[in-house]
Amino acid sequence: YTKEYAAQVNHPVKYSWYDAMTYEYGRYHEDGLGEYNYQFMEKEGDKVPADHFFANFNWTKEKNDYSVTMAQWLGRSQYDVFAGLELQQGGSYKTKVKWDALFDENGKLRLSLGLFAPDTITSLGKTGEDYHKNENIFFTGYQGDPTGQKPEDKDWYGIANLVADRTPAVGRTFTTSFNTGHGKKWFVDGKVSKDSEWNYRSVSGILPTWRWWQTSSGTKLQADYDFEDAYNGGNSLKFAGNLAENTNQDVRLYSTKLEVTDKTKLRVAHKGGKGSKVYVEFATQKNYTYGGENARKELTLTDDWTKDEFDLGELAGQKIYGIKLTFENTAAVGDYQFNLGELTVTDNQETPQAPTALTVAKQSLKNAQEAEAIVQFTGNKDADFYEVYEKDGDTWRLLTGSSATTIYLPKVSRSASATGASQELKVVAVGKNGLRSEAATTNFDWGMTVQDTSLPRPLAENIVP
């Protein structure tokens, strides 16, 4: 009934049935699709009660064999059955998994994987960098390459070794600043606009599909996120190491399905890389074959952040299925480093509309120099997210980024040299094509000057070990 009703209101839903109840006899774990629970997956005409089946965690090869047989008997795909992996108790990629019970004679999965509590990764480290290292082990494996083999002394297969890649980079517009949703600073066009740590998950960008799929005729460059230097947001991609002479190497970054028109352009923000040639290359075949005509663009390398733009109109009518970087050098280069800050492929060169009706909906003063507030405004469909700034003297300073149009500001501040009883705020839309809009502005009314209150004394240092 719920599926029928959801379809009527144009909001269809899908159900995954957890292997905890039988059809007739109450609670019981079969650890697979079996004779007591198959009814939840049995077709009724062209309809199915449950779209997927999540098998309890104690499956074996024999139980998985039976799940495959039962799914086929029901006329369902065996991959509608998910073998549950209990990652919370096991400690993410430290979980012991009976992999042999999942593979066929060709080493392919016989069932889909049901990942219970994959966010357990967050408990394995203390910093953002720790998180990404553990995330890469979980999804890519200890070998650090989704195409590589699992090390013999390790139990964990990276998830990317077992499933085909999929991508959100589709259509005619794709842009990314590689934003992980957190950072030590916030950069705007290569300059620091917020010099403190932040965590705004809703501004996360599309991260590389493969981390890291590299080939090299010599030693591979070390690929990583760089939280010390970025073009926009909190981080860039960094490729660093020592280059031996006459080295060629590729870093395959994205699986895509991008349509190219006669108006499509490529924009790339980058820094460093001198001593080599760096190219952005496109695969225009589904099998990620590179080397097509007009599908290779050389970047102009400098020591500072710079932005290259290329016309891709010669590829009009084709699709881009993959994006990679290629590094070539003849002489050896020590302490080599290249940062990639932004990558955009789009046929939309229009700046997004500016937000409107910006107001301070609520505010609460802590003293004459610090307050908290909620701002509201009207956004637009072309925006990916919004940046909120405060003006202190002649300087605009970022307060936060968000995809919402009602935004909490935990700290609005002004310096001791500020004059007057009001302060200007602004909101800028960052478009889905990577371009910024004009700003919407409003005034934050402090109702007092900075001399009207004193600041609290800082807390005494805790010297107790």
Named regions from a protein language model:
Residues 60, 78-225:
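Substrate-binding cleft of secreted/luminal carbohydrate-active enzymes
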Residues 237, 249-278, 308-311, 343:
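Extra-cytoplasmic beta-strand recognition segments
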Residues 268, 307-343:
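Extracellular beta-strand ligand-recognition surfaces/modules
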Residues 367-383, 465:
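Conserved aromatic anchor
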Residues 221-250:
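Short carbohydrate-recognition loop motifs
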Residues 2-37, 50-61:
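Aromatic-lined carbohydrate-recognition surfaces of secreted/lumenal glycan-active proteins
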Residues 408-446:
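Beta-strand-rich modules
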Residues 287-319:
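Extracellular carbohydrate recognition and processing domains
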